[in-house]
Swiss-Prot record:
It comes from Xenopus laevis. Its EC number is 2.1.1.201. Its main location: mitochondrion. This is 2-methoxy-6-polyprenyl-1,4-benzoquinol methylase, mitochondrial. NCBIfam families: MenG_MenH_UbiE (TIGR01934).
Length: 310
């Protein structure tokens, strides 16, 4: 009996030690430091604070984009779509898609292609009456996106809510899905999408490397990764002006328009903490992507990085 009690006592001690180590390991993981803007915080705190930032700014997000960039963000996003060149049947994952700007442009692009093809088709047909022409357009209407689809994925439910309301208001319904999901752990199977885009979102991710690996995983072989993000200005004079504007003007705009100085102070700081164009290019390559390059827009205020899953 004494021997048995000794064995049981030893096993209980062993179990307590295992539990203690597991608890210590969990505590250590939760306390791993990262950055929230210029502040050092735990990884868990960063996730919570970033979520709160976008929860706070969701309803003023589009207005602030126009105000902060003086409307230039529209040109940057249009440029991204021109680089993408959507084709019929393309499946797009619009990560951190929030209020839908990239996906709406994607749908517009596909619709414009469809209209162009219908016009070309009708030009080659002779002696068409107006009812014939009208019927041709009506018959094509059901397949207006020609099998193309955009999945808008965002970790922030308030951003998705605002985006969905916006899509209904603007008449976008066909070919869109709205999914709550984490860029570091996507709720999709392997090899699902032709294109993965993330616009002004990846700098807010806690583990950028993990998000890049997930992007690679969900893309089909031959699929393309496209990232539009604030970057490092390569014009010395513009860089000085940009710094003054970023730190002295943007937080003020945030306070005046959105009644939220702190969120926009963080956004400015997060831009400065983001890797340079070459550093981010190397990170994309490390995730497995091939033929990685980037294009600077507005002297490097933003950059579009591109890579392929080959």
């Amino acid at each position: 009996m004494a021997h048995m009690r000794s064995v049981l006592r030893g096993r209980l001690c062993g179990m307590r030690e295992i539990l203690r180590c597991q608890k210590a390991s969990y505590t250590e993981a939760s306390r791993k430091e990262t950055h929230f803007g210029f502040q050092a915080v735990s990884e868990e705190e960063k996730r919570e604070r970033v979520y709160k930032v976008f929860e706070n700014v969701a309803h003023n997000y589009d207005i602030m984009n126009d105000a902060m960039s003086l409307g230039v963000h529209r040109f940057w996003k249009d440029w991204l779509l021109q680089l993408m060149k959507p084709t019929p049947g393309m499946q797009l994952l619009d990560m951190a898609g929030g209020t839908g700007d990239i996906s709406f442009r994607f749908i517009n692009y596909i619709r414009a292609q469809r209209e162009k093809w219908i016009r070309q088709e009708l030009k080659f047909q002779q002696d068409l009456s107006w009812p014939d022409i009208s019927k041709t357009y009506q018959n094509k209407e059901e397949g207006s996106l020609m099998g193309s689809r955009a999945v808008i994925c965002d970790i922030n439910k308030e951003m998705l809510k605002v985006g969905l309301q916006k899509s209904l208001r603007l008449g976008y319904s066909e070919g869109l899905s709205w999914v709550a999901g984490d860029a570091e752990e996507l709720p999709f199977g392997d090899d699902k999408f032709d294109v993965y885009t993330i616009a002004f979102g990846i700098r807010n991710v806690t583990h950028i490397e993990q998000a890049l690996q997930e992007a690679y995983r969900v893309l089909k072989p031959g699929g393309r990764f496209l990232c539009l993000e604030f970057s490092h200005v390569n014009n010395p004079l513009l860089s000085k002006i940009y710094d003054v504007y970023s730190f002295q003007v943007i937080p003020v705009l945030g306070e005046v328009i959105a009644k939220d100085w702190k969120s926009y102070q963080y956004l400015v700081e997060s831009i400065r903490r983001f890797p340079s164009q070459e550093e981010f290019k190397a990170m994309i390559e490390d995730a497995g992507f091939s033929k990685v390059n980037y294009h600077n827009l507005t002297s490097g205020v933003v950059a579009v990085h591109s890579g392929f899953k080959l």
